[in-house]
Amino acid sequence: MSDARRYHALPSPFPMKRGGQLQGARLAYETWGRLSPGCDNAVLILTGLSPSAHAASHPDGDTSPGWWEGMLGPGKAIDTDRWYVICVNSLGSDKGSTGPASPDPATGAPYRLSFPELALEDVASAAHDLVKALGIARLACLIGCSMGGMSALAYMLQYEGEVEAHISVDTAPQAQPFAIAIRSLQREAIRLDPNWQDGHYTDAAYPETGMAMARKLGVITYRSAMEWNGRFARIRLDGDQRPDEPFAREFQVESYLEHHAQRFVRRFDPACYLYLTRASDWFDVAEYGEGSVMQGLARIHVRRALVIGVSTDILFPLEQQQQIAEGLQAAGAEVDFVALDSPQGHDAFLVDIENYSAAIGGFLRTL
């Protein structure tokens, strides 16, 4: 199986919004489909916190399923027979793009906490530099999911007139206090792990306990009480599945959280986790509108937009999607707003492919 990732060298130095700069930085990305002669069929996908650029499999390359496998491909909602699709791994991540886990060219050691403060505007700027390098003057559609939806807003705010249509998926124009509080606890769990060592952890002494707790807190917010009740109720583990220690796991829901945590702890770098979650806290469309989200959204000019939210999302509540839809419409866009009742909460866009495909595919077919 060949690696379908490609790498784009960013300008060196690459200036960061909150100060500092990167030398020799790169962006990992993957593409599907073929760019049209007029370069007018490009779709850019900006991801959530942890995904790589591998949104879907490649028949002639990396055939492993991608994180949005059911959404992207020939004849699917995002039809690669029509669209040239680009998915980037966010700047600051650890899935190929330069981030806190990358070696600092000046020292050869990982950046860790010496990495400059990261803003989602930096994520957007890096993606924009790639788009320009590919010869694309204007995106046919910009898709942003979760954190990537905020990065997409940053992209459109910084590069006015360079996006024809936008699909906003389960995102927000700014983080609400609940989301900030949860992410604060996640970072605290990592930093309080003795193996964190102010960012000087190693593979042998790795903050697994802190990462596991951070992931468990995240999973709780990514799903909904409706799903917890429907899947687990109060079902207990069989006796042979319970650890033999006081206050250990007893309910199935506890085992589920532990399973997801253990799958994650070594798959995502702790320092990258801190940087990207804080960048999500900092982003605020109101900064572009003299303190007003609606005035900030008024600076975004696209012809068409689809805004999707889910009623069970507690991390980015549905009213925040409604706010984006109203703001883009007030700025002159023709907006479709879709409110779904999926029980999976914030993660519904990764799970409820049937309903999200219907909305996204239906919208793209009208472009």
Curated annotation (Swiss-Prot):
Catalytically driven reaction(s): succinyl-CoA + L-serine = O-succinyl-L-serine + CoA; L-homoserine + succinyl-CoA = O-succinyl-L-homoserine + CoA
Domain of life: Bacteria
UniProt domain AB hydrolase-1: residue ranges: 41-351
Acyltransferase among keywords: yes
Residues the record lists as binding substrate: 215, 347
GO cellular component terms attached to this protein's record: cytoplasm
Primary site of residence: cytoplasm
Active site per database record: 146 (nucleophile), 313, 346
EC number(s) given by UniProt: 2.3.1.-, 2.3.1.46
Pfam families per the UniProt record, alphabetical: Abhydrolase_1
NCBIfam families in the cross-refs: homoserO_Ac_trn, PRK00175.1
HAMAP family named among the record's database cross-references: MetX_acyltransf
PANTHER family according to UniProt: HOMOSERINE O-ACETYLTRANSFERASE
Protein name in the entry: Serine O-succinyltransferase
Organism: Frateuria aurantia (strain ATCC 33424 / DSM 6220 / KCTC 2777 / LMG 1558 / NBRC 3245 / NCIMB 13370)
